[in-house]
Amino acid sequence: MKLFLTSLLLIAALAAPAANNPAVESMQRKLDRIQANGESAHPRPLTTTMTEQEVNAYVASGRVRLPKGVQSARFSGKPGVVDSVARVDFDQLTAGQRSANPLLSMFSGVHEVAITAHASGAQGVGHVHIDSVALDGVQIPDFVLQMFVNHYIKPKHPNLGIDNTFQLPDRIDSAAVGNHELTVSQK
């Protein structure tokens, strides 16, 4: 489950609830139940729905390690689509890597990044496709985004990109983004 959420974290944004937030505790219980069921010798069919509020509170609580440079992340869902907004310090994110390409120079300093992605999971396989990315409200052309991914993301995370396919953890068979929620099912 954390891998799926981490993939979605590449799609990021802003929130900071209190440490004992009921939404954080509810999310933790759900993740624990999913993990325990997935590790069971005889897992039972289990469907778990996580609300947008729970996901955002959990991410903001610090229980999910955001990539270096991602200062905050907030997600919203509608059927099959995840929208996110993140505050990203590109100098931290790209530390130690520079490019002579002037098109990549926009990826420096601290910016608000808005991402829209299609996300789903079926037959134990998750799929995330980044549809669009905006930097401080300005749409990033696809070819520039692909250059950024190739130069800064792929060297550290070769399995991440614009299109992502991965094995769902904990015997999760399906994952569906709905209106302000994420529902996962284990077989």
Model-found features: residue ranges?
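Sec-dependent signal peptide recognition
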Residues: 2-8
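Extracellular/lumenal and peripheral-membrane lipid-interaction modules
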Residues: 17-187
